[in-house]
Amino acid sequence: MKYLVIGLGTYGRELAINLSLQGNEVIGVDHRSENIEAVKEQLMTVYELDAKDENSLKLLPLKNMDIVIVAIGEDFGASLK
């Protein structure tokens, strides 16, 4: 399966890595470079961008994904957008 995980904090990072270890294709998205650095070797692709920015979201291959997971916990409003 193809997953897109938006938000690579504690929860999103563990989820994305575990999905990848299970043989899934996982793309990770986060706006913090330290979160990107922590997973870039374990995920298929990573994007450093702000998921609250609609123009940035247009850069993501959303139509190619089977499942999109929003794992944004610090800004609840961003996770609802």
Regions found by a protein language model. Name each.
Residues M1-K81:
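Cytosolic regulatory regions of ion transport systems
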